[in-house]
A protein has these predicted regions:
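Non-transmembrane, membrane-proximal soluble domains of secreted or membrane proteins
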Residues: 1-208
């Protein structure tokens, strides 16, 4: 009994320190994860490294994140729904938020989880160690369609990740094509996302 108490007494603070010790922003891939009933939206900065401005007043079905088409910083951004690609062996900082109710971003195979709460920005981080396709689910009851709130996290080789970024940019013309604004003369309509079936679970990554 004493041994168990001592183990927990040392392990919990060390694990908390590990989880909360975020990698430097320049080393990590920063992704904005915006949950909504009943899907996860992903927002990545383009080659300029800057995220475009978002405005709740611009949110529509075709522009789920409310990206401002007049903001130059967002012209090269990438927005996807349901599927996120990340490079293997590179830290990922996922900044979680929600448009409606409380959700929970959960990657079971990697033991990554974090709440997405309206009005809050909650960061979590992890380092994917193996390439593959992993299931993403919402672990918080969020409405009648909760059972179908699923997606995929694809861990690519660095080469495949760069190819995916190039493909997304060519298909959508940056975020302005993937998530257009209703303003006159705005960007193009979003391109359909290709879904992938989850692969067998891989060993979990540290952090999260």
């Amino acid at each position: 009994m004493i041994e168990a108490v001592l183990l927990l007494g040392f392990a919990i603070p060390l694990w908390a320190k590990r989880v909360n010790q975020f990698p430097p922003g320049k080393e990590a891939l920063v992704v904005h994860v915006v949950a909504q009933q009943f899907s996860f939206n992903y927002h990545l900065a383009g080659p300029d490294g800057q995220f475009g401005r978002r405005d709740a007043l611009l949110v529509t079905n075709s522009n789920p994140l409310g990206l401002d088409p007049n903001d130059p910083a967002g012209k090269d951004d990438i927005v996807t729904t349901g599927e996120l690609h990340v490079p293997v062996n590179r830290p990922v900082i996922a900044e979680l938020s929600s448009k409606d109710v409380i959700h929970d971003y959960f990657v079971p195979a990697m033991r990554i989880a974090g709440d997405a709460i309206p009005g809050s920005l909650i960061p979590i981080w992890f380092t994917p160690l193996k390439t593959g396709t992993y299931e993403v689910i919402c672990a918080q009851l969020c409405g009648l369609g909760h059972y179908g709130m699923k997606g995929t996290l694809v861990v690519d080789t660095p080469q495949d990740y760069q190819a995916w970024l190039k493909e997304r940019a060519e298909l959508s013309g940056g975020a302005q094509g993937a998530a257009p604004s209703p303003a006159p003369g705005g960007p193009q309509q979003p391109q359909p996302q290709q879904s992938k079936q989850p692969a067998p679970a891989a060993s979990p990554s540290p952090g999260g």
